């Protein structure tokens, strides 16, 4: 697990490097599917002092199997997403400014241009609000459940992120570094959408044919973006 702990540590350290977190407002995890184990950031540990050995290993029930610290308070959310979405290898949660602003406004981040379409096939959805019962009960687990509910039948890697109403963004990918990459993109397109709608409040969504072209040339069966 040492290699995965190092990867998760590096991915967590990318969050302040890319300006996605303030203080300890974020966490990254990754899963070893063969072993059924998840590595996640410890709860409340400052990035300035954190080390790879501080990463916490939990099983799929959330039981700590390795590590001196308590795991992130959002662990149950991560675990629910891993259980329900077999294609996910890494998950990120932040309170990055612009994506969180859309979450607090209760609005999906609209697909307005090709930067968005290169990564997200359509709007980045916003979940419904959790009920008082859901919050007072198993809050973090129910956060994961409302994310799954909002995704519906969508392929998670075609919509590699979501904003949770009144909370903030979650992003994911094939591994921890891919998840962070998608979290960075989500924050950037959230900022772009906010600026663009400020310039033109009547701005329409990107044309569907342009959306399809940009997403499929990177992620479709006949993708040709980048090097093989």
From Swiss-Prot:
Keywords: Carbohydrate metabolism, Isomerase, Metal-binding, Zinc. The keyword DNA-binding does not apply. It is an enzyme of class 5 (isomerase). Pathway: Cofactor degradation; L-ascorbate degradation; D-xylulose 5-phosphate from L-ascorbate: step 4/4. Its cofactor is Zn(2+). CDD domains: Aldolase_II. GO terms for cellular component: cytosol. Zn(2+) binds at residues 74, 93, 95, 167. One of its GO terms (biological process) is pentose catabolic process. It comes from the Bacteria. Catalyzes the isomerization of L-ribulose 5-phosphate to D-xylulose 5-phosphate. Is involved in the anaerobic L-ascorbate utilization. Belongs to the aldolase class II family. AraD/FucA subfamily. This is L-ribulose-5-phosphate 4-epimerase UlaF. The gene is ulaF.
């Amino acid at each position: 697990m040492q290699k995965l702990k190092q990867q998760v540590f590096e991915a967590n350290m990318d969050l302040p490097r890319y300006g996605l977190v303030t203080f300890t407002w974020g966490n990254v995890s990754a899963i070893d599917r063969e072993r059924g184990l998840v590595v996640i950031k410890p709860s409340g540990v400052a990035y300035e002092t954190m080390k790879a050995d501080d990463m916490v290993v939990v099983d799929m029930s959330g039981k700590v199997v390795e590590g001196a610290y308590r795991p992130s308070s959002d662990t149950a959310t991560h675990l629910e997403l891993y259980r329900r979405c077999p294609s996910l290898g890494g998950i990120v949660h932040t309170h990055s400014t612009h994506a969180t602003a859309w979450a607090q406004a209760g609005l999906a981040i609209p697909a307005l241009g090709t930067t968005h379409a290169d990564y997200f096939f359509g709007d980045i959805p916003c979940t419904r609000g959790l009920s008082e019962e859901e919050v007072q009960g198993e809050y973090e687990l129910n956060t994961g459940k409302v994310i799954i509910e909002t995704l519906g039948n969508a392929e998670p890697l075609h919509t590699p992120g979501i904003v949770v109403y009144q909370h903030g963004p979650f992003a994911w990918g094939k591994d921890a570094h891919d998840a962070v990459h998608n979290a960075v993109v989500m924050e950037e397109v959230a900022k772009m959408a906010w600026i663009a709608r400020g310039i033109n409040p009547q701005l329409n969504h990107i044309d569907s044919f342009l959306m399809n072209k940009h997403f499929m040339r990177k992620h479709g069966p006949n993708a040709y973006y980048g090097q093989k």
